[in-house]
């Protein structure tokens, strides 16, 4: 006998599968794979390395989707047979439960593969954290967020490089940027941009009062050098300074840190992680180029958001997620409604539940 809970899960899976098939067709995916494979057999396509790389990335993504579409279809066929036999065989009812559990994982994986179809979704990601008003309290919160994303990246098997790290005077950070290197790093993290709110008993308050702190997160893709963005030397203010950052294994101290201000937009980028001033300058210019490119894309789409590396107002009205440590424990995303009471796991990088829900939420909003 199949339980009511399992039947409910089956109905939800069928709905999700129907939604998937409304936007992707297995035969069309296989046909597109054949077309790209045919193009890649032409030696002339490799004359344009950028185009060839785009083809190979797309081919890899389509092959993953094709394999997972076939797997999900096969699992649904197995489920149909198991359901027919379950009325007479209790062991088969248990097998239904096992297939449903396997299907849930397979459908979720397929959903994400279909959703992660943006031009720069496969790229590495620059992630910056900036504390809001509130001094040491918000600076400590910013460092907690930075660690959360580093732990998430480590869980994914991604590499993390500190690009900039400016410590707070007592604790925490005034500013930090990391480069997360891994397949679809930007695709996963792009909706983490926004204001994150913390409510807790402050460890810096002798009276043990409850404090609310804010920090902003900004995520941009690492883009290729051949992207056509003009940066005129006369538009740049370039300063050098001695790095004062710390961060254990991630930070390589240097006396050749570089700060670049793009005068027309006011965008400021810094780099202190490389071993020479020249390398720091090149990395900072690369980040600036990525920010300017994204700014152009936003203008073309007529979106109102600013993506200059910090939000206009790091305050009450703009938060995307709240992290409450006191008087109860709760982390809640205000866009998707996803929440959990396990704040320790979240702060240790267990944030896939939020990221996956964001991807589905924004994909449905965009239609």
Swiss-Prot record:
It comes from the Bacteria. The keyword Protein biosynthesis applies. It is found in: Cytoplasm. GO terms for molecular function: translation release factor activity, codon specific. One of its GO terms (cellular component) is cytoplasm. HAMAP family: Rel_fac_2. This is Peptide chain release factor 2. The gene is prfB.
């Amino acid at each position: 006998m199949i339980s009511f809970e399992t039947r409910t899960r089956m109905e939800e899976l069928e709905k999700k599968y129907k939604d998937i098939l409304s936007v992707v067709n297995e035969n069309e995916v296989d046909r597109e794979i054949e077309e790209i494979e045919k193009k890649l057999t032409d030696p002339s396509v490799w004359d344009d390395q950028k185009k060839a790389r785009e083809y190979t990335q797309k081919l890899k993504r389509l092959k993953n989707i094709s394999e997972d579409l076939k797997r999900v279809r096969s699992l649904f066929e197995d489920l149909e047979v198991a359901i027919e036999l379950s009325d007479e065989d209790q062991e088969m009812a248990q097998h239904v439960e096992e297939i449903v559990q396997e299907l849930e994982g397979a459908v979720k994986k397929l959903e994400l593969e279909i959703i992660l179809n943006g031009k720069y979704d496969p790229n590495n990601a620059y992630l910056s954290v900036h504390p809001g008003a509130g001094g040491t309290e918000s600076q400590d919160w910013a460092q907690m967020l930075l660690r959360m994303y580093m732990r998430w990246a480590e869980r994914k098997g991604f590499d993390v490089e500190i690009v900039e790290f400016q410590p707070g005077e007592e604790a925490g950070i005034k500013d930090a940027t990391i480069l997360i290197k891994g397949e679809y790093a930007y695709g996963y993290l792009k909706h983490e941009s926004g204001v994150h709110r913390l409510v807790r008993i402050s460890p810096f308050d002798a009276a043990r009062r409850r404090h609310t702190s804010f920090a902003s997160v900004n995520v941009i893709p690492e883009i290729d050098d051949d992207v056509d963005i003009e940066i005129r030397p006369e538009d740049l203010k370039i300063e050098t300074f001695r790095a004062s950052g710390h961060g254990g294994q991630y930070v390589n101290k240097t006396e050749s840190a570089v700060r670049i201000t793009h005068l027309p937009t006011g965008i400021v980028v810094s780099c202190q992680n490389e071993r020479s001033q020249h390398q720091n300058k090149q990395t900072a210019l690369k980040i600036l180029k990525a920010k300017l490119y994204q700014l152009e894309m936003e203008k073309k789409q007529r979106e109102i958001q600013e993506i200059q590396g910090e939000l206009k107002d790091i305050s009450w009205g703009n938060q995307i997620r709240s992290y409450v440590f006191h008087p109860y424990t709760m982390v809640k995303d205000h866009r998707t409604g996803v929440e959990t009471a396990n704040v320790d796991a979240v702060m240790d990088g267990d944030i896939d539940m939020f990221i996956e829900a964001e991807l589905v939420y924004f994909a449905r909003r965009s239609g």
